[in-house]
Amino acid sequence: LIKKTPDYHITINMASVRCDGLESAASFADAYNFYPTDGMTLFQRSGDEYFRIMGGWDVTASPGVTAREGMDKLVPVENWRGYCSRSNFAAGATDGGSNAVAGYIFEKMNASAKEGVNDKGNSEGLNEVLYGFKAYKSYFILGDYMVALGAGVTNKRPELDGEIRTTIDQTAWTDEVFSMKREKMELVASGTHSLLSADGTPLWLVQKGKFAYRILPEYTREAFVTCETRPTDWVKRNKVNEKKQGLPSEARILRLWANHGQRPVDDTYGYVVYAGRQIPSDELPFRVLQNDTLVQAVCSMDGKVVEAVLYPGNKGLQAEGLSLSASAPCAVLIREEAGEIVVSVTDACMNAALKGIRIVLNGREIKVPMPQGMLCGKPAVIRVDRMTNQ
């Protein structure tokens, strides 16, 4: 899922079992492509927020990714199929405007382990730090806000070293960083700090000229920020860098993350990133309707935009003033405009036999035909009159 405006670029990358991941080629190119399709979420304004610091990245803290910490345990490999999720559930929906929704069930696997693979590389049996945990991850874009929700975060291998964490961002630290509450800003010093104030309320964390971050404390128990300078090893990341001169010996990094601990079972997280140029308000312009392993959903405060990820086994969404259900697992975006309801739906399992999905919104049935053939899995967008089904 990509949102691009003249001022910023947001990318969210997910790979279900239907897809392969990004290849690694330790002997001659990228050696650490372990996490790019694990829900990686990138926020860019100048375009160089990440590649200028890649040499010093903690790869296990890739932005947007839920993972076990342990950069020192990663072994570079050649893996021509990359990594994906064991689940067939992944979807994104948008009507082409300023809003979007995406979500997937994440439980990492090596794509080379699929049947019929004849180019496995040398990754089999290596890097157990990558595996053994699960999360339901969703993303909601409402204007200049990106909301991320997680549920069912469970460590299935708690005997392995390393806590489970969800990284909010790991980006270039290029300017002053402030914490903000009630529009009062305080400079954040280097080191590690909580993203909650002393009284337990959330703070906005703002990097001057870049993006603003805030956790949703009802879903996030612990979250931290660190401003740090790390040594780089560009050649270790990619052999091609042997031929490059003048690469920086250290990287200044701003990193934010939610911590799930060593033994999470059905843990959650929630955070928001503001990409606009204004000072973000303490009053958020949206509310979370549900965040669990059945439904993850958000709506705008005026109720004109509703976004939901409906997982297998769900019984629909019931919230104050709103009921929503679907006849198949999907991602749904509903937007009101000038006498119409714009409905965007994506089949999350890319079922080629599925001809349509029936949406029931506040008791009203809306039938949405699914794209067929080579367009299977594409968002379907329909417009209906607010008063009739025409």
Predicted regions and their residues:
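Extended polysaccharide-engagement surfaces of secreted carbohydrate-active enzymes
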Residues: 1-354, 360-365, 379, 387
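Solvent-exposed serine/threonine-rich low-complexity stretches and specific carbohydrate-binding patches
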Residues: 366-374
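Mature N-terminal, pre-catalytic/accessory segment of carbohydrate-active enzymes
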Residues: 384-390
